[in-house]
């Protein structure tokens, strides 16, 4: 014991000497003990104890050497979040690093492994005393490293339909009438969860009152919009229902009895299964600076770690109708973080989002991280809504440059984000909101139910703190699953000067195709007031509705892109579609040097909408020229134009040119290198070259590095489309 008392001071004294090449090291091992001194021979057993040792080291004086906490392979259970404050900071010269040391994974787990299951017919069952006593519950379950769905009706991919909203009329947000046989007076009615899908978001509800005779259900929380909105009869399913436990992979927790029931998948055995239930809700690792006090978590690095097993927060008053699910939190959540790094980490089995650098975060880096199996989205950068006049959310400030605490100069590079949106279906692969100078590059994003990348985040049309963001060389594909609508491979919102979307490869975007409401799945989508954005050298193909769509906006430049094999379904289904508002100055848009390759022949549309912004006179809001149009099915190419209440005018190219568009454009086979194999580079003799259109090489989009990392997406199993 005497040796243990003196070793740490000896280490610390040596660290106070500024000799060159020195480093402070602590060790953590599952076989360690927190009463030990944290050396390789006598490691700690918890990361929090090592964190305290770093603080003790700092308390003796300014760091003069880098500090490394070496974490040996194994699983480290956590009953509460690991919180880093300004007291845990390093410096530029002496960062503090928490890293994996040795072969094998290091897992920071917010869950508890469950053992002792018994076979009961086709199910495995386990009685959990803490659940029966009311001390623990969970709404997520992870088996052999993958999330399993809670028992639901109807089963995954299918839905019931709302009959009518309650209360009746436009304000029906508290409940609805349901169809015969869809809902029952289940024994655990207070624990049942209704999940309702609208266009771009979903809401989660607990039951307040059920009237089986009149087939009505009322909820403890209201929906963000009426249940009659969008398509009149929204889709929904009911989760955590014992009677819904009817197919392999599902599970049900009876809180009254404390019994967990699991329907195993074929091939799963009790002898080698790992079943983990989360103890920690929402956030596992927290970087908690104090921006208002000018104190930040700085120069802390995390290398080679896995963070797993959190729950979702589903209170009875949950309000979660925000676009992009920005009400939810993340497994790794940062406020007031600067110069922090997550590299070569895996973030998985999260109840909500994966990673979020939120308020006042500067110069942080997320690189080569594998973020997957998520209740929500992947990686979020920036802040929630900032409404206001000119300076959104910051009243009293006269110019954007003086607004405090803006998130800026952050980078998300070379990350693989996939298999998300399991609970909060309107979440994003990588989201950038009210942030500036963000770089999102070389990421692969797939198997998400909503948009791949979103950037901007203001509806007002005023200046915002979102500007100079770069979205480049990302590979975004197999998203939507025909589950969510009003989405895109890349989606923007609001005025974003200096923002560039370039050299991205986007394909297999499949939006929900409503039988009554509008349908929009786009390759690239500039929504509400998007302005001052450059869209250049992107390739978008195999998209359900529009290759490119702009919904009001000004001074956007769409240059040298390929929009190919666009299905062009529905009224918004066109190769390129431009809208503006009469009475609103949505001017200065340019679409030049693009190739539109549409099987249906629906090439381009420009419309000025009459609406709440006033009628006004028609005006030129977009310059469209020097483009190449072609139908791979040799269909007649059509172009459409409309102004306010005027009837839609359909043209061939000649009529379209007489209306003032595409004067130097052509209809011709662009002679792609191999469109059947989705190679849309330009082959020899392409007529596009005569118009100054350059061939686009998509090979650099997505991940880079060693073959094991670059090939990792090849093992991804994409979810099936919803059956609606």
What would you call each of these model-derived segments?
Residues 365:
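Core nucleic-acid recognition elements
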Residues 6-18:
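Bacterial N-terminal signal peptides
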Residues 1-3:
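N-terminal secretory signal peptides that target proteins for export/translocation
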Residues 81, 312-334, 348, 352-362, ...:
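Glycine- and acidic/polar-rich repeat regions and solenoidal domains
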Residues 21-24:
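Boundary at the C-terminal end of the N-terminal hydrophobic targeting segment
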């Amino acid at each position: 014991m005497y040796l243990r008392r003196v070793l740490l001071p000896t280490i610390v004294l040596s660290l106070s000497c500024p000799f060159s090449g020195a480093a402070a090291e602590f060790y953590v091992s599952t076989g360690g003990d927190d009463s030990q001194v944290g050396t390789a021979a006598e490691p700690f057993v918890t990361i929090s104890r090592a964190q305290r040792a770093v603080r003790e080291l700092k308390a003796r004086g300014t760091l003069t050497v880098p500090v490394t906490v070496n974490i040996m392979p194994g699983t480290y259970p956590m009953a509460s979040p690991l919180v880093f404050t300004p007291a845990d900071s390093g410096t530029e010269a002496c960062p503090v690093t928490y890293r994996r040391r040795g072969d094998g994974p290091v897992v920071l787990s917010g869950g508890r492994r469950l053992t002792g299951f018994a076979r009961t017919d086709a199910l495995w069952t386990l009685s959990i005393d803490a659940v029966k006593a009311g001390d623990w519950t969970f709404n997520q379950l992870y088996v052999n490293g993958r999330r399993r769905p809670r028992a639901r009706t109807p089963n995954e991919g299918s839905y019931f339909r709302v009959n009518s909203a309650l209360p009746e009329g436009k304000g029906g947000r508290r409940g609805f009438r349901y169809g015969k046989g869809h809902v029952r007076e289940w024994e655990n009615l207070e624990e049942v969860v209704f999940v309702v899908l609208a266009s771009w978001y979903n809401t989660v509800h607990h039951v307040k009152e059920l009237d089986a005779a009149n087939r009505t259900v009322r909820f403890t929380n209201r929906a963000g919009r009426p249940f009659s909105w969008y398509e009149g009869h929204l889709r929904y399913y009911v989760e955590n229902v014992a009677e819904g436990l009817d197919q392999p992979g599902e599970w049900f927790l009876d809180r009254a009895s404390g019994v967990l029931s699991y329907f195993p998948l074929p091939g799963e055995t009790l002898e080698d299964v790992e079943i983990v239930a989360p103890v920690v809700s929402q956030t596992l690792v927290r970087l908690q600076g104090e921006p208002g006090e000018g104190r930040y978590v700085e120069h802390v690095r995390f290398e080679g770690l896995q963070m797993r097993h959190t729950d979702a927060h589903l209170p009875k008053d949950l309000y979660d109708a925000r676009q992009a699910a920005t009400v939810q939190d993340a497994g790794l959540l940062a406020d007031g973080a600067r110069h922090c790094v997550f590299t070569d980490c895996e973030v998985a089995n999260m109840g909500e989002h994966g990673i979020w650098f939120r308020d006042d975060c500067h110069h942080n880096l997320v690189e080569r991280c594998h973020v997957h199996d998520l209740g929500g989205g992947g990686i979020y950068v920036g802040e929630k809504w900032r409404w206001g006049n000119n300076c959104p959310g910051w009243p009293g400030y006269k110019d954007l440059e003086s607004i405090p605490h803006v998130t800026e100069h952050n980078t998300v590079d070379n990350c693989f984000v996939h298999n998300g949106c399991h609970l909060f279906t309107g979440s994003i692969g990588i989201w950038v909101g009210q942030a500036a100078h963000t770089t999102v590059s070389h990421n692969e994003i797939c198997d998400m139910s909503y948009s791949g990348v979103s950037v901007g985040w203001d509806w007002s049309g005023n200046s915002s703190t979102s500007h100079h963001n770069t979205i480049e060389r990302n590979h975004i594909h197999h998203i939507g699953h025909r589950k969510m609508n009003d989405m895109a491979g890349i989606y923007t919102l609001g005025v974003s000067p200096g923002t560039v979307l370039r050299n991205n490869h986007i394909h297999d975007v499949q939006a929900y195709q409503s039988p009554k409401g509008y349908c929009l799945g786009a390759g690239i989508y500039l929504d509400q007031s998007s302005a001052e954005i450059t869209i250049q050298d992107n390739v978008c193909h195999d998209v359900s509705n529009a290759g490119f769509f702009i919904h009001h906006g000004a001074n956007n430049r769409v240059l040298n892109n390929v929009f190919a094999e666009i299905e062009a379904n529905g009224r918004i289904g066109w190769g390129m579609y431009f809208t503006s508002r009469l009475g609103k100055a949505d001017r200065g848009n340019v679409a030049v040097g693009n190739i539109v390759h549409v099987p249906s022949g629906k090439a381009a549309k420009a419309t000025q909408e009459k609406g709440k912004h006033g009628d006004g006179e028609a005006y030129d809001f977009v310059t469209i020229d020097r483009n190449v149009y072609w139908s791979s099915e040799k269909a007649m190419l059509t172009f459409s134009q409309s102004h306010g209440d005027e009837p839609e005018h359909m043209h061939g190219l000649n009529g379209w040119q007489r209306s003032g568009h595409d004067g130097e454009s052509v209809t011709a086979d662009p002679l792609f290198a191999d469109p059947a194999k989705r190679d849309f580079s330009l082959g020899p003799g392409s007529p596009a070259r005569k118009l100054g259109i350059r061939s686009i090489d998509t090979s650099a989009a997505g991940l880079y590095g060693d073959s094991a990392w670059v090939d990792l997406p090849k093992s991804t199993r994409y979810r099936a489309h919803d059956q609606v």
